[in-house]
Structure formats: structure tokens, C-alpha cells
């Protein structure tokens, strides 16, 4: 029986001092249920025994080999070297790969890592490792010298050992599929930091009043409007997060209400410290924050990939609006029938509205108006219209014509000025997209 394990261990130890873990790691895929430290320790003992045997059988070269490798092997070789060749044992340098830091970094990463997992209310985590370049290079050199081919990387060992020891403390588990956080271990520095995944909730909001913005809109004199985002701040407080972001499927004008179906959105809480708050509690906090002006429904947890789906979805989904429209000189039944015939099913050619030109590129969009149903109001030059339109059609401009930038328009068909004085979104099409997995 030849021993390629011993041969490659000797090749590595002839050139590099290696701690038990870093030697054992060269053979990580041999044997089961042992730590690399146990492997390294065992290989060192058997190697010393084998060299000792050869010396006892008169092999002069074996004694030279043993004496010269002893500093790299370490303490376990001391007694036999001193016995065979008194006074020739020398202390070796620190481990060529880990600098002797591996044990202590693993131990301290577990301490600090556990504290962080608890502080951020994490149950499912993964461990990542940031390796200094020098360590990776030393690891490659030693692997090359040993030529073993059954090893694993120091990164893999740190990840596994830290993960295993954290799990053994209880209350946490390694989860590669849906971790709540990643612990990053610096090696050999030993620092640990935590990347906490956001909380994501599928939800809906209703804006029951006008002049409410979707995003928080700060000015030196305080917020410009009350906002959907601001209404959600109690959720931020409840979860102990650092920041809250609303990913809504589109947005209505500040002065439009959002009624009916409500608008789908994903609420994101960044760096939360409390993750397991029941949806009903979050919803109650949000509704308290909405002060009766904004209502919320929290539906389920969401996945990160669904954020993009919600945002993409906004572009073309159907929406139903209620508009209160003032018409110069009043409106008759003949007018509303004329509007319906001219515009229902029509493709509206719309240049970017002049009111948003300062922040949006000037493009031409084509959006279909699926249906239009207007009723004149008694005793006033007003009509109430229910419109179903392709997402992205600007309704106020469809009414006014925006100086000819939107065609056709209510004003163009009627031959008189028309202005949308109230707008409500009453329904937003929503496929409830779900990310795979
Ligand atoms: Zn080492």
C-alpha cells in the first residue's frame, strides 16, 4: 500500500509551515464526518510515525527529512526529533496559508455573528467570506506543492464551520434559498458584518382625498403634501427599519384620488430589526398613519424579483377613471353621445404633457381609450365621465387637448374648451404577478 496522502502532505510540509486545519483541508474530501483539523492532526501523526519507522530501519535520508520538516509540522514532531537527534528541533513560523488565524477568526466570527443575527431578528442566514488576496495566493501555492486534488477552499471551510457553529447555538438555520441575511466574514482580518435583506410586502393603497403624493416630498417648510409613503412610517417604526420604499404599480396625479380596487404596490423596509410582525399589525399601523386619508391592505410577503414585475406591469395595464369635466358653454346629451362615438376605442396620440415636460422627455405615445361613458350634470356646465384606458394615457390632456399636443381630445371633438377638474382612479388591472421559485 503506497500512501499518496502522506507523500503529498510531506511535499507541502517540506516547503510550508501548515496548521492542522490548513493541512487537513488539502484532504477535505477524504473521510467523512471529520473536521479538517482532525484530518490534519491525523496526517501529521502518521507522517511522523512513517518517517520514524524509516529512521529505525536505517534510512539516513528519512532522519534529514524529518528534522528539516519538523518546524513546519510543529509540536507533534518535537519529541521524536529531540529523541532521535537531540537539540535539533526548531520552532517553525506561523501557518503559510492562514497565519495561524483560522481558529481564532472562526471563533470570533461565531460570537459576533450570533450577536448580529439576534440583533436583526434573523432566523435564516448564509455566511459569505471576503478573503485577502494574499491568502488566496498562498492557498494556491500550497495546493500546487501538495498536488493532492482532494481539497476544498479556505472560503468553503470558513463558511461551513461558522455556519455549523452558529446553528448549534440554536434558533438560527442556514438557508441558501431564502436567507434573511448574509454574514460576511473578513479573513484574516476577522471582522464580521451583516447584510440584512429587506422586508417586502404585497399591499394596496387607496387615496380617499386629493392632494396626496405617493412619495414623500420634503421641502424646507415641511412636506409639500401628505404622502402615501409618510402614511407608512408607523410600519417603519414597528419593524425598526432604516428606510421605507414604496414600489407601486404606477402612480396617479397628486390631485387624483385612488379609489375602487386600490393600487397594488410592494412595500420595502430596508434593514429591519424586527421581521416577524403579523400582517394585520402592519396593516393597522399603516392605516393609523393614513389618518383616514390613505387606506392600506397588506396581502402577503413578496419576493425581490416581484418588485420589477410590479413596476413593469404599470406600463400598459388597463385603468378605469372617474373624471369631472367642465365644458365651455355647457354639455348636452348630443355632446356626450358625440364624444362617445368619436373617442370610444380610439387610439389617442399624445405628446408628453406640457405640465410634465420639465422632467420627462418629449415623446409621442399612442394609447387606446377602451370605453367612455359621460353624463351631463343638471344645472351646471359639467359632466361626469367614466373612462377605461390603456395605462399611461394622460386623462387631463385627453380632456383639454393640451394645446394640440393630445389628439383627438374632448375639446377637439366638442369644438369648445374642456377641463378635467376632478380625477379619480377607480380600478387598476392587476395580474398579481408571482416570481418563479
Ligand atoms: Zn492554517
Curated annotation (Swiss-Prot):
Q: Report the superkingdom from the record.
A: Archaea
Q: GO molecular-function annotation terms?
A: tRNA binding; tRNA pseudouridine(55) synthase activity
User: Mind listing the GO biological process terms from this record?
Assistant: tRNA pseudouridine synthesis
Task: Fetch the PROSITE patterns from UniProt.
Answer: THUMP
Q: What is this enzyme's EC?
A: 5.4.99.25
Q: Where is the THUMP domain?
A: 76-198
State the SUPFAM superfamilies in the record. Pseudouridine synthase (SSF55120)
Which Pfam family name is an example for this entry?
Pus10_C
Residues at the catalytic site = 253 (nucleophile)
Give the enzyme class. Answer: isomerase
Is Cell membrane a UniProt keyword of this protein?
A: no
Instruction: Name the UniProt key words of this record, in alphabetical order.
Output: Isomerase, RNA-binding, tRNA processing
Q: Which InterPro entries match?
A: PsdUridine_synth_cat_dom_sf (IPR020103), Pus10 (IPR005912), Pus10-like (IPR039894), Pus10-like_C (IPR048741), Pus10_THUMP_arc (IPR055174), THUMP_dom (IPR004114)
Enzymatic reactions: uridine(54) in tRNA = pseudouridine(54) in tRNA; uridine(55) in tRNA = pseudouridine(55) in tRNA
> Which residues hold substrate?
321, 394
Its annotated function is as follows: Responsible for synthesis of pseudouridine from uracil-54 and uracil-55 in the psi GC loop of transfer RNAs.
Stated family: Belongs to the pseudouridine synthase Pus10 family.
Q: What is this protein called?
A: tRNA pseudouridine synthase Pus10
Amino acid at each position: 500500500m503506497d500512501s499518496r496522502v502522506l507523500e503529498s502532505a510531506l511535499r507541502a510540509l517540506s516547503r510550508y509551515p501548515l496548521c492542522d486545519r490548513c493541512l487537513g483541508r488539502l484532504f477535505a474530501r477524504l473521510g467523512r464526518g471529520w473536521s479538517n483539523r482532525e484530518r490534519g492532526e491525523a496526517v501529521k501523526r502518521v507522517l511522523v510515525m512513517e518517517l520514524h519507522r524509516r529512521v529505525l530501519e536505517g534510512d539516513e535520508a528519512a532522519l534529514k527529512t524529518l528534522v528539516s520538516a519538523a518546524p513546519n509540522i510543529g509540536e507533534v514532531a518535537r519529541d521524536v526529533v529531540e529523541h532521535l537527534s537531540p537539540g535539533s528541533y526548531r520552532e517553525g513560523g506561523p501557518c503559510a496559508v492562514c497565519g495561524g488565524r483560522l481558529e481564532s477568526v472562526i471563533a470570533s466570527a461565531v460570537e459576533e455573528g450570533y450577536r448580529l443575527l439576534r440583533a436583526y431578528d434573523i432566523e435564516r442566514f448564509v455566511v459569505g467570506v471576503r478573503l485577502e488576496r494574499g491568502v488566496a495566493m498562498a492557498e494556491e501555492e500550497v495546493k500546487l506543492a501538495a498536488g493532492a486534488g482532494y481539497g476544498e477552499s479556505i472560503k468553503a471551510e470558513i463558511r461551513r464551520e461558522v455556519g455549523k457553529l452558529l446553528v448549534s447555538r440554536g434558533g438560527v438555520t442556514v438557508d441558501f434559498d431564502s436567507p434573511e441575511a448574509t454574514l460576511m466574514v473578513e479573513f484574516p482580518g476577522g471582522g464580521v458584518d451583516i447584510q440584512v435583506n429587506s422586508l417586502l410586502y404585497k399591499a394596496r393603497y387607496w387615496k380617499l382625498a386629493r392632494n396626496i403624493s405617493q412619495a414623500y416630498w420634503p421641502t424646507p417648510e415641511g412636506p409639500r403634501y401628505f404622502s402615501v409613503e409618510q402614511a407608512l412610517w408607523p410600519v417603519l417604526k414597528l419593524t425598526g427599519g432604516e428606510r421605507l420604499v414604496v414600489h407601486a404599480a404606477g402612480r396617479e396625479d397628486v390631485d387624483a384620488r385612488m379609489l375602487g380596487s386600490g393600487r397594488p404596490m410592494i412595500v420595502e423596509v430596508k434593514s429591519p430589526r424586527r421581521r416577524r410582525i403579523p400582517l394585520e399589525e402592519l396593516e393597522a399601523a399603516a392605516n393609523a398613519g393614513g389618518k383616514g386619508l390613505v387606506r392600506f391592505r397588506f396581502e402577503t410577503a413578496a419576493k425581490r424579483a416581484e418588485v420589477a414585475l410590479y413596476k413593469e406591469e404599470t406600463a400598459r395595464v388597463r385603468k378605469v377613471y372617474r373624471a369631472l369635466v367642465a365644458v365651455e358653454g355647457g354639455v348636452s346629451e348630443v355632446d356626450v353621445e358625440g364624444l362617445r362615438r368619436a373617442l370610444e376605442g380610439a387610439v389617442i396620440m399624445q405628446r408628453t404633457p406640457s405640465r410634465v415636460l420639465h422632467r420627462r422627455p418629449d415623446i409621442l405615445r399612442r394609447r387606446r381609450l377602451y370605453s367612455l361613458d359621460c353624463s351631463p350634470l343638471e344645472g351646471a356646465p359639467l359632466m361626469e365621465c367614466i373612462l377605461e384606458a390603456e395605462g399611461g394615457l394622460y386623462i387631463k390632456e385627453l380632456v383639454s387637448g393640451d394645446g394640440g399636443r393630445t389628439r383627438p381630445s374632448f375639446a377637439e371633438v366638442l369644438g369648445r374648451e374642456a377641463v378635467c377638474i376632478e380625477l379619480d382612479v377607480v380600478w387598476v388591472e392587476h395580474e398579481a404577478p408571482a416570481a418563479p421559485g
